[in-house]
């Protein structure tokens, strides 16, 4: 019952606040790597993952991996995209590729980052 109450709240959000993750940070977490990695990423080549946002991996083109959604426990992609403000903060220069993919996906509506990261993203657009 508790999760149903929360799930109903997801349908009426005004804002989401998030950060980005890299696949390397997922792999650095021994527990996640050993217990979830083999199943979640079995059909996804490591080099194809540009980043992760709200638990979902995507490629540099901003495409989310479709088979991944069934493993998500929490807010659905549909509810994420219906939320009008999706605010993201990126402050690590090593996340420029993750940021570029996320921006291409359309999942971010508002962004806070610094000039150096923005410049790195612009350099990688082509």
Residue ranges and their predicted role:
Residues 1-125:
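Conserved phosphate- and dinucleotide-binding cores of soluble alpha/beta proteins
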């Amino acid at each position: 019952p508790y999760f149903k109450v929360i799930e109903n709240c997801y349908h009426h959000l005004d804002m989401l606040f998030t950060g980005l993750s890299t696949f390397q940070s997922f792999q650095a977490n021994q527990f996640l790597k050993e217990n979830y990695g083999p199943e979640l990423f079995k059909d996804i080549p490591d080099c194809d993952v540009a980043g992760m946002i709200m638990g979902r991996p995507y490629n540099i083109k901003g495409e989310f991996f479709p088979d991944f959604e069934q493993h998500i426990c929490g807010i659905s992609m549909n509810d994420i995209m219906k939320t009008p403000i999706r605010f993201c903060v990126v402050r690590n220069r090593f996340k420029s590729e993750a940021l570029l993919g996320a921006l291409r996906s359309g999942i971010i509506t508002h962004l806070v980052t610094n000039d150096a990261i923005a410049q790195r993203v612009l350099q990688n657009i082509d």
